[in-house]
């Protein structure tokens, strides 16, 4: 049972080689934002903590430049 659990966690990397996290790469950033505009969790994104920090900064910068929408706070 422990072995199958370990194998189920192996996944393809969320960011392919040659792709860089940048605030100008909107198509990449949209993959890590929910429909409501929220940044998805690191567990959902399958990113390392360093990649998640860079991604968060890039998404926030894209929001400031109006490339991505801010999250909708209404229910």
Swiss-Prot record:
Location(s) in or outside the cell: Plastid
Gene Ontology MF: a single term: structural constituent of ribosome
Entry keyword set: Plastid, Ribonucleoprotein, Ribosomal protein, RNA-binding, rRNA-binding
Taxonomic superkingdom: Eukaryota
Main location: plastid
GO BP: any one term: translation
NCBIfam families, A to Z: S18 (TIGR00165)
Family: Belongs to the bacterial ribosomal protein bS18 family.
Quaternary data: Part of the 30S ribosomal subunit.
HAMAP family from the UniProt entry: Ribosomal_bS18 (MF_00270)
Protein name: Small ribosomal subunit protein bS18c
Originating gene: rps18
